């Protein structure tokens, strides 16, 4: 069976534009979460914090005109613009841009998103109601379709092996990478750029999640403290925006062109809660089986596992269920959960929804490569029962030799996924 490696990375998040910027800020314990106070459209909404991408012309800020021509801005929704941004960095990093037609024929795209961009749909609906159909943009449908990130990336670079989109809520980015992994193993492509993108910080989304009691409201006066996975004072997630991309490549193909290899992707596990549309099963069954199946495909045991990048969104129910699942996985092989490192980068960037699994995969790959555990910000103490607690890497990054790591993503609708990354060895 073919082996698959990671040869390129790209990211734009609330921590900044670019993988190097993201990793440095993550490891230094910085936060990209800011206040929404002062914006009248959010005045009546209980949650007033969000993980917002820094925009501007400075080196580490995101300037859309570096990635999309001015004349095309009205045609391309923000979540697609972000996908083009992360894809551009990942492909450049992988040295996979100036390629011939045969290579394009063997290259595909897998991208995920949860909501995409509601702004354009809402705006055009307003235009229809106020000015009638003559004023409605003929481009509105092509702007809001969820598969546009994959479509635009494919078109820009001429990749024709496959063009695939996952729309599985907060697991979409993870599923896109996992599907790409399997596509390469099955011989459908030699190279696939995979990831996720999301840009849905708008009043309707924030109001909807607020009404569902999903978002943090306690820390409106202290935004950087609002996202606090596993901490006793957590009260909901912080919505965020961004995109991340990884270049997945068949091993022999990568070796033949002397590509730089970050890590190997070796497992992809899936499971369904079949319990509740928005809440996880408290016993963590689906999370457990997703991780177990990921390790099984990798041909590994939980005894060989060194780190888990948790989905942990800073919600009361979700963080406990995931901790229970992780503890069960470790106890299967008689390991001590309290000594096992588990961290969540959502304390730093918030919850990027459909892009979460993609950026967290980037962080996990770098954890494996560099041997540094990202911290869980704002962790003081946990209310999770003692027997289910892990080492949550509180507030400060630490060095550790990492050979095998999991990255978890779970979503509304009961969807669960886990990716297994391994230090690359010949």
UniProtKB/Swiss-Prot annotation:
Q: Which keywords does UniProt give here?
A: Acyltransferase, Fatty acid biosynthesis, Fatty acid metabolism, Lipid biosynthesis, Lipid metabolism, Mitochondrion, Transferase, Transit peptide
Name one process (GO BP) from the record: fatty acid biosynthetic process
This protein's pathway: Lipid metabolism; fatty acid biosynthesis
**EC number, as in UniProt:** 2.3.1.41
Compartments where found: Mitochondrion
Task: Look up the domain of life of the source.
Answer: Eukaryota
The residue span given for the transit peptide is 1-18
Here the disulfide bonds are: none
Reported function: May play a role in the biosynthesis of lipoic acid as well as longer chain fatty acids required for optimal mitochondrial function.
Name this polypeptide is given: Putative 3-oxoacyl-[acyl-carrier-protein] synthase, mitochondrial
What organism is listed for this UniProt entry?
Schizosaccharomyces pombe (strain 972 / ATCC 24843)
